[in-house]
Regions:
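A short acidic, Gly/Pro-enriched loop at the edge of an enzyme's catalytic core
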Residues: 73-85
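A short SAM/SAH-binding and catalytic strip from SAM-dependent methyltransferases
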Residues: 83-98
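Conserved class I S-adenosyl-L-methionine
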Residues: 113-143
Length: 238
């Protein structure tokens, strides 16, 4: 899956602004996640595993310079083999976002971590996404709301650990305007009453323990003994 316009956008003032927030937020999110295998799916131009303490860190995507070239909806990794999966903007630019999540659930170990970066449709960025007809990145994506994404994750057995909003500055194209509106980033959504244009969602794959019901042999033994016929003593008449 090659995303048209992505390379150019990453080098714009807007792209650099988003990358800066996402990189810092991801560094904090994965710093205390431990294990043996970490995987970044998509957006190989950015290293979102740079702060991970996990020894084996790989990038996988459908195009670009990566460790593994593959379809994100059919991952070539064994089930229950990965401790951490990072999904930076892979869902909103995929034709089968739900299948990607199913594959992620399959390869994650129980209690494994999933961290998603996405554009928020309920924001100023989402408003531009709705009305921008240029077809350029990132305005042509199918943004996923947090409510919908949480529902999908719940159905797959994930528990949302935390969500972090970011990029409260309006989606201006010029760096001068991004700097002029930067005071909104500092205040965040606490003062302005609307969420940020980007979210980071951290979820954990939960495996609920099954209760194994075994036969109560003691009870059955007592029951069978109680039902056992007792030999009758026969009296002898004189």
């Amino acid at each position: 899956m090659s995303i048209p316009g992505l390379e150019h956008w990453l080098e714009t003032a807007q792209g650099r602004y988003v990358r800066e927030w996402e990189s810092a937020s991801m560094d904090n999110a994965i710093a205390d996640v431990f294990g043996f295998n970490a995987l970044q799916l998509g957006l190989p131009q950015c290293d979102f595993l740079r702060a991970s303490r996990i020894p084996l860190r790989q990038k996988a995507a459908e195009a670009g310079t990566v460790d593994v070239l593959c379809e994100l909806a059919a991952l070539p990794f064994a089930s229950h083999s990965t401790d951490l999966v990072v999904l930076p903007h892979a869902l909103e630019f995929s034709a089968d976002a739900h299948q990607i999540l199913r594959e992620v659930e399959r390869i994650l170990i129980p209690e494994g971590h999933l961290i998603i970066l996405g554009f928020n449709p309920i924001s100023l960025w989402g408003l531009r996404n709705r009305f921008d007809r240029s077809g350029s990145f990132p305005w042509h994506g199918a943004y996923l709301s947090l409510t919908r994404l949480k529902d999908w994750l719940k159905l797959l057995g994930f528990e949302v650990d935390r969500g972090i909003p970011g990029c409260h500055v309006p989606p201006c194209d010029q760096e001068a305007w991004l700097k002029r509106w930067h005071f909104m980033e500092t205040a965040g959504g606490r003062w302005w009453g609307f969420p940020g244009g980007i979210y980071l969602l951290h979820a954990i794959k939960r495996t609920h323990a099954m209760r194994l019901i075994t036969p109560n042999w003691r009870k059955n033994a007592v029951g069978s003994k109680a039902l056992r016929p007792v030999a009758q003593k026969e009296g002898h008449g004189r």
